[in-house]
């Protein structure tokens, strides 16, 4: 007899090896052919909506691992919400305007080789244009309108390039119709949003210091500034008193000591601002001392005087002391220009470093500007000698025409020459840099357009509305709320104007006399918006003002400024959710999800525009994830050589491995990735796949429509397996997924597969699956539970392992185009006595774990090989005996041993020994009935009955 044919050893088309990198592209092609996203929209139509609004990545360059993390997290949420019973459309988007694209076009125009290799079609257009217009082959002075056309084309190419990589990750979405901030409709609606802000009174023009990048030649948003270490020259500079008598009186003296000059000493890290000094600041409540030194009388904050004098190499005796308030309005002479600087008191002066006296250049510092304006300095009196490219105006004495960074050492020399330099030394400190050019930026006063944070509109300010918006938003993780709250509470007015070409215009006509917008501005903005909606932003830049203004055109200038790109993305709730994609989406969004840097970026700008336009945040929830670092916690860097590209992972391991890594990592902090970490992820995947393969193989001859048993007819163990599956479902589908705790979900799923399934239930039921009659109730009981467990497990895994879950689902259902994402979470059958059942079997599992340890001791001693070679005798106490006795002979199947004896006793004792019986060739149990039947001398009686007789029945295991 061929015993192998009597055992139910089944196979499955679901292979052991995933071979994901090779097979995933084929599955993606099938999804596209099946129009999976569109089909899903039809299936989910009419359900409650869940809107995850995509924060647009910038359309420039290949996606990196951070992009992959972001898109995968979004996809997991969209899929899990869909399976939870929501209509969760996902419309991806791109941020398309702005300086990086302009710079790429500038490089192409100048013939940069790398830029040409990256965008040969754009280079070809430039070449054709030069030929067609009779220009020199290297001509760089091309019309702005043509440059904008090239920017639009370049952005379109980048969108397609990134889209391909995002789709490769398995992300389901409206890829055929994404939103792009450069679509004509979006550009027009941005102008309409601007018009609403203008009408409400939030928008104003003003002179203010704003972040300025000399390389960009433009103002920057706070989100476009990053901090890096920079070494600056620190200087202590003496400003001589212009009013000695008043100074003496301030210190309570009748006169200054005879023959002594007095100076206030300031400390700064920006020597280049000294030519623009217009005031000194002291704190009204600090003590200031007048110190007699070898270099005359010096005014210093009393708490900093000792350190300052040591720094200067001087000794000093305190002559007098006064509060800072007493020095208010006294004047001091500029070190090398013939003018005086008044003292203004200010609460922002600190004793953290320096001298306690701050030099004030109102054109180059926010606090300096506010202090001087508060004390009556008019805008036209503010000195602003630094031009947009970082050079001083030619008319500035001593330093005209020099770049400020080159002028720094020369200014220090000049101060030394005139005897005003008390000390200088280098200081390494954190300093703002342009995020694009990585070069230092400055504050520079320019006339710009601002959204006012503290202008009262309809009874409240934008700051108040935004702070309430933060309070009304749920944050994941929770610490994000305090962070965004602090940013809003302390931020200045929002500078929304930029001096660039490739951006949505601020289409104002300004009166040549007053500089004020045309009285019909709201009406004109709508007229411009309609033109832009038809022709794009070039419609404004090429517009003849007379077309809209008629004879008035001569009295007005057409603005050339463009909007901050953060206004582009910050108004997507207006021009996407309620604009280009209003039919698919809804407002407000349920969730915005981006990296933690977006508290000062997209979350921030969206909050401000939402609260200005609608009085509320445009989102109900905010989720932030950390940045990706290497295995040692270092930032990804080409120079360090630790960059791991998502494309490489997809091509070598498969996107499901990348998705599993993302889902298994706590994204609330930094996400570490390395080859070693990915190997661990691959091992976890392999264990999951092997579990799925076992489940599918043992269901390959099971038809749930004809073979499934009612829950009440299942064995106790199989009902317990359903309880365990229900526990997992409750933890994952009803808790982890709704609160976006994916790493906790994956820990639970992997733990379930390892402990509840592999090490327990599946281990026990193998005997029943393999050795009982194929259509026996005992086997069908196991298969009924297996079917529910498999559907539930695949359903829970599907948001993460979208490719693998699909492959397994189709193997389970036999339907080539089916997918878990088309179905809501699998509804597990109710187990009537679940609580009591679970309590009993939890006790049995604990007992089994103890007995396994004892068997392992025997195995290590060489007494037994497998656990089936062991016999167990249990003396059970009064609490345990009824439970074990009820199982009778089936207890041996639970313990996977050949015999179990149970007797009552005062306390529980366990004895494990090697069996002395013969081994059944078919079931591998050691049993005294082996050899009893001459027809099958190698079989036990149980196996003989399962082959030739009625077959065994099971109630418990």
Swiss-Prot record:
Keywords: Aminoacyl-tRNA synthetase, ATP-binding, Cytoplasm, Ligase, Metal-binding, Nucleotide-binding, Protein biosynthesis, Zinc. L-isoleucyl-5'-AMP binds at residue 594. Its cofactor is Zn(2+). A motif ('KMSKS' region) lies at residues 635-639. Transmembrane segments: none annotated. GO terms for biological process: isoleucyl-tRNA aminoacylation. GO terms for cellular component: cytosol. Binds 1 zinc ion per subunit. InterPro entries: aa-tRNA-synth_I_CS, aa-tRNA-synth_Ia, Anticodon_Ile_BEm, Ile-tRNA-ligase, Ile-tRNA-ligase_type1, Ile-tRNA_ligase, M/V/L/I-tRNA-synth_anticd-bd, Rossmann-like_a/b/a_fold. It catalyses: tRNA(Ile) + L-isoleucine + ATP = L-isoleucyl-tRNA(Ile) + AMP + diphosphate. Zn(2+) binds at residues 920, 923, 940, 943. It is found in: Cytoplasm. ATP binds at residue 638. It holds the Pfam family tRNA-synt_1. It comes from the Bacteria. Its main location: cytoplasm. Its EC number is 6.1.1.5. A motif ('HIGH' region) lies at residues 57-67. HAMAP family: Ile_tRNA_synth_type1. Belongs to the class-I aminoacyl-tRNA synthetase family. IleS type 1 subfamily. Monomer. Catalyzes the attachment of isoleucine to tRNA(Ile). As IleRS can inadvertently accommodate and process structurally similar amino acids such as valine, to avoid such errors it has two additional distinct tRNA(Ile)-dependent editing activities. One activity is designated as 'pretransfer' editing and involves the hydrolysis of activated Val-AMP. The other activity is designated 'posttransfer' editing and involves deacylation of mischarged Val-tRNA(Ile). IleRS has two distinct active sites: one for aminoacylation and one for editing. The misactivated valine is translocated from the active site to the editing site, which sterically excludes the correctly activated isoleucine. The single editing site contains two valyl binding pockets, one specific for each substrate (Val-AMP or Val-tRNA(Ile)). This is Isoleucine--tRNA ligase. The lineage of its organism: Bacteria, Pseudomonadati, Pseudomonadota, Betaproteobacteria, Neisseriales. The gene is ileS.
């Amino acid at each position: 007899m061929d015993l192998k044919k009597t055992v139910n050893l089944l196979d499955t088309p679901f292979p052991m090896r995933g071979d994901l990198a090779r097979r995933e592209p084929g599955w993606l092609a099938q999804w596209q052919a099946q129009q999976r996203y569109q089909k899903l929209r039809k299936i989910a139509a009419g359900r409650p909506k869940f809107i995850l609004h995509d924060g647009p990545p910038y359309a420039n360059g290949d996606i990196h691992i951070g992009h992959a993390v972001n898109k995968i997290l979004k996809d997991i949420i969209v899929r899990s919400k869909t399976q939870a019973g929501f209509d969760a459309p996902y419309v991806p988007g791109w941020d398309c305007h702005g300086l990086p694209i302009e710079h790429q076009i500038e490089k192409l125009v100048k013939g940069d080789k790398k830029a040409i290799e990256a965008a040969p079609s754009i280079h070809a257009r430039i070449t054709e244009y030069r030929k067609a217009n009779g220009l020199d082959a290297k001509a760089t002075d091309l019309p702005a309108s043509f440059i904008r056309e090239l920017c639009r084309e370049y952005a379109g190419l980048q969108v397609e390039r990134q889209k391909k990589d995002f789709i490769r990750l398995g992300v389901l979405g409206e890829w055929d119709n994404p939103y792009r901030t450069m679509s004509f409709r979006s550009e027009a609606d941005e102008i309409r949003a601007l018009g609403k802000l203008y009408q409400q009174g939030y928008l104003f023009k003003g002179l203010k210091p704003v972040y300025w990048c000399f390389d960009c030649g433009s103002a920057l948003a706070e989100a476009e500034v990053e901090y890096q270490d920079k070494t600056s020259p620190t200087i202590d500079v003496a400003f001589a008193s212009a009013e000695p008598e008043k100074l003496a009186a301030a210190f309570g003296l009748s006169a200054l000591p005879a023959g002594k000059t007095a100076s206030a000493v300031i400390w700064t890290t920006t020597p280049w601002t000294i030519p623009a000094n217009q005031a000194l600041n002291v704190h009204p409540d600090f003590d200031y001392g007048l110190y007699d030194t070898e270099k005359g009388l010096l005014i210093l904050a009393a708490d900093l005087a000792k350190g300052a004098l040591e720094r200067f190499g001087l000794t000093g005796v305190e002559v007098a002391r006064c509060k800072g308030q007493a020095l208010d309005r006294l004047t001091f002479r500029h070190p090398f220009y013939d003018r005086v600087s008044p003292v203004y008191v200010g609460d922002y002066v600190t004793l953290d470093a320096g001298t306690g006296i701050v030099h004030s250049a109102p054109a180059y510092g926010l606090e300096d500007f506010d202090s001087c304006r508060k004390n009556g300095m008019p805008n036209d009196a503010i000195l602003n000698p630094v031009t947009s490219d970082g050079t001083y105006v030619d008319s500035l004495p001593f330093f005209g025409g020099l770049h400020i960074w080159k002028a720094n050492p020369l200014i220090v020399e000049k101060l030394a020459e005139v005897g005003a330099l008390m000390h200088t030394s280098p200081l390494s400190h954190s300093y703002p840099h342009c995020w694009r050019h990585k070069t230092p930026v400055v504050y520079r006063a320019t006339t710009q357009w601002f959204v006012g944070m503290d202008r009262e509109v309809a009874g409240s300010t934008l700051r108040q509305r935004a702070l309430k918006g933060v309070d009304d938003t749920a944050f994941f993780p929770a610490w994000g709320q305090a962070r965004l709250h602090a940013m809003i509470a302390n931020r200045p007015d929002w500078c929304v104007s930029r001096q660039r070409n490739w951006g949505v215009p601020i289409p104002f006509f300004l009166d040549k006399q007053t500089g004020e917008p045309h009285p019909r501005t709201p009406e004109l903005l709508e007229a411009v918006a309609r033109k832009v909606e038809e022709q794009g932003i070039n419609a404004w830049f090429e517009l003849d003002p007379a077309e809209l203004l008629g004879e008035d055109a001569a009295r007005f200038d057409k603005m050339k400024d463009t909007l901050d790109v953060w206004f582009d993305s910050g108004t997507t709730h207006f021009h996407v959710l309620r604009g280009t994609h209003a039919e698919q989406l809804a407002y407000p969004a349920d969730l915005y999800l981006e990296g933690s840097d977006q508290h000062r970026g997209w979350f921030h700008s969206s909050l401000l525009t939402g609260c200005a336009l609608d009085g509320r945040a445009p989102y109900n929830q905010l989720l932030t994830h950390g940045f990706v670092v290497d295995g040692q916690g270092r930032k990804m860097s080409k120079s360090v050589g630790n960059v791991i590209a998502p494309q490489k992972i997809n091509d070598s391991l498969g996107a499901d491995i990348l998705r599993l890594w993302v889902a298994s990592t706590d994204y609330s902090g930094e996400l570490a990735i390395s080859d070693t970490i990915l190997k661990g992820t691959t091992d976890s995947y392999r264990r999951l796949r092997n579990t799925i393969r076992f489940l599918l193989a043992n269901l390959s001859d099971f038809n749930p429509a004809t073979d499934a048993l009612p829950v009440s007819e299942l064995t106790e163990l199989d009902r317990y397996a359903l309880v365990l599956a229900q526990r997992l479902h409750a933890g994952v589908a009803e808790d982890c997924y709704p609160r976006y705790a994916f790493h906790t979900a994956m820990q639970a799923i992997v733990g379930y597969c390892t402990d509840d399934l592999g090490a327990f239930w599946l281990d026990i039921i193998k005997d029943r699956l393999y050795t009982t009659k194929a259509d026996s109730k005992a086997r069908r009981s196991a298969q009924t539970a297996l079917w529910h467990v498999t559907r539930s497990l695949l359903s829970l895994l599907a948001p993460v392992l979208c490719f693998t879950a699909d492959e397994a689902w189709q193997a389970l259902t036999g339907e080539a185009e089916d997918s878990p994402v088309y179905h809501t979470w699998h509804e597990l059958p109710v187990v009537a006595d679940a609580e009591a059942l679970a309590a009993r079997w939890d006790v049995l599992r604990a007992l089994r774990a103890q007995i396994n340890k004892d068997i392992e001791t025997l195995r290590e001693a060489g007494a037994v090989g497998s656990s089936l070679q062991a016999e167990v005798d249990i003396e059970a106490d009064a609490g345990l005996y009824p439970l074990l006795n009820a199982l009778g002979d089936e207890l041996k199947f639970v313990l996977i041993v050949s015999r179990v004896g149970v007797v009552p006793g005062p306390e529980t004792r366990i004895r494990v020994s090697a069996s002395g019986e013969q081994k059944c060739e078919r079931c591998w149990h050691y049993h005294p009935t082996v050899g009893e039947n001459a027809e099958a001398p190698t079989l036990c009686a149980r196996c003989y009955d399962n082959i030739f007789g009625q077959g065994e029945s099971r109630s418990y295991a």
